[in-house]
Structure formats: structure tokens, C-alpha cells
Amino acid sequence: MVIGLLLTAEVSSLRQGYLTYGLGVGLGVACCYVPIVATVGAWFEHRRTLALGLAVAGIGTGTLVLVPVIEQVIETHGWRQAYRLFAVISGVLLLIAAVGARRPPVPSAAPGGVRDTIGGRPDFWILYVSSVFTSACLFTAFVFLADYVDTTGTSGSAALLLGLIGMSSIAGRLGFGAIAAKVGTIGLFRWSCLSLGLSYLIWVIADTSYPILVVFALILGVAYGGIIALSPAVVAELFGTVGMGGVLGALYTANGIGGLIGPPLIGTIIDASGYTAAQLTSVLLGLAGGVMLFMLRSSTPS
């Protein structure tokens, strides 16, 4: 990931950026995130959802803290320096995590591998397709919210809105993680996905009202945080913690597909029909992802 960020700082064309950031940083994130989440999930049993919520709260904290900082760095020193700063911060934090990590007291891989763990399990594919829809919905805000604020002439900071998404996602990760054990992990996960889709209706209503956009960012962030915190716990509940990293790795490719398909689709709709049609499409994507989860049932393997 550090190498990808440093190389991105040196690109001279957008195509090079696709390679260095999309492939380099993308592979780095995948190699870091999945093992970290799987390790935390394997270490804890009784308070797994809370532990996972705490672990992934760092993503929201990073969004909250670094977005305004990087925006300022770009304005004063340029985007190349911003990527270099990201590389340094990432390298230091990853080194600390690598030194402090310990193997969990359970086998790291299932005896038969991922294929045997998810083979013949329709619930995995329900989760997979749901994640494609949900990710496509989520990335609409991350990719197009700043452009929307600029295009519509809305009076307010787009960076602040993205920061609020990160801040409220921390509350979602911690809050949903804490209460999931009491109300049911899968049920709470369903409603997180449904809430994500429904939040885009607030964006439709907002038009150029910045205060309503703030409400949208906060609700979206809470729902997003719940999804991030609960998805590994759902995997642990359905498939167990043995080989959890492999199952999560397979499942998270759905997020990549959603992120790959969603923004171009939404961008095409914006160009053809405007933002309202794109926002409503995001509503449908989020609702589709949430509704599919009603086909899941809790079945923790022994």
C-alpha cells in the first residue's frame, strides 16, 4: 500500500494512476484489512461484535481526521505531497500493527479450505450479491457528493460532509457492535443495509440545503459503520471463525465488484438524467441489498 501511494504521487497520466492507486493501493488494502478483521474476530467470542466495532472504528476515525488535513495539504502543497504524506502515515501505522499483532488461539484456515467452507451454502451467495448492491449504493456518496455540492452551488464544505460520514460511522461501528449481541447480529445487519439505501432519500429531499445534507451524511455514516462492523460478525455467525479470513476475503471481492460497477453506472445516469435519477437508483441498490438479507438465517457452525 505504501509503495502504491508513493508511486501514485509520481504519475503523469490518469491511466498510470489507475494502475498505481487502483491496483497497488487496492491490493495493499486488501492484504491488510482482511487479516486484521479476521484476527480480531478469531480472538473474541462473547463480545466479538463489540471488538470488531472497535477495530474497524479506525476507518471512520481516519476519514474524520485525515480528509480535512489532506484537503489542506492539497491546497498548500499539491496533491503529490498529499499522497506522500498518506504513504508515511500508512507506513508508520502498519508497522505498529504488524509488530503488535498476535496469532489467534484457533486455526487460521479451515482443513478443507474456503471452497469446502462455503461450498453448498446458498447463504454465502446471498451475502455476496447483497454486498455487491450495498457497495454500489455506498460509493455513490463517496464519489459524487463533492461534485454535487460544487455543481449545484450548495453553500458549504464537501470535505466536512465526508468528514461527518466518517465521524458518524464511528458511532455506527461502536454502537451497532455493542448492541448486536443483544438484538441479533444478522437482524441488525439487515437494517443497517436498508437504512443505507433509505438515507439517499434524504439527499433527494436536500436539494441545495446544506443542513439537510449534513443530516444525510450523519445517517449514511451510521448505517455504513454498522455494515462495516457487523459483516465480519455475520460471517463468523454463519460460517464459524476457523478459516474466517478466507471467507471474508472471498466475500469482500463483492465489495470490489460493487465499487467497480456502481460509480460508472451512477455517473452515466447523472450525465443522462441528472442527480435525482442517480440518487433514486442508489436507493434501489441499497434496498435490494437489504431485502436479500431476509433470506439469511442464523446457523453458527459447531
Task: Give, region by region, the residue ranges found by the protein language model.
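Intracellular juxtamembrane helix-capping segments at the cytosolic ends
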Residues: 30-44, 226-239
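C-terminal transmembrane helical hairpin of 12-TM major facilitator-type secondary transporters
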Residues: 157, 165-169, 175, 183-234
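Helix-loop-helix hairpin linking two adjacent transmembrane segments in secondary transporters
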Residues: 54-55, 59-102
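Extracytoplasmic gate region of multi-pass secondary transporters
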Residues: 122-178
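A membrane-interface helix-boundary motif in multi-pass transporters
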Residues: 72-88, 268-285
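A late C-terminal transmembrane helix in Major Facilitator Superfamily
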Residues: 224, 238-275, 282
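Interfacial helix-cap and linker-helix signal at transmembrane-aqueous boundaries
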Residues: 65-77, 149-150, 179-180, 265-274
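Hydrophobic core of transmembrane alpha-helices in multi-pass small-molecule transporters
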Residues: 4, 16-31, 132, 212-225
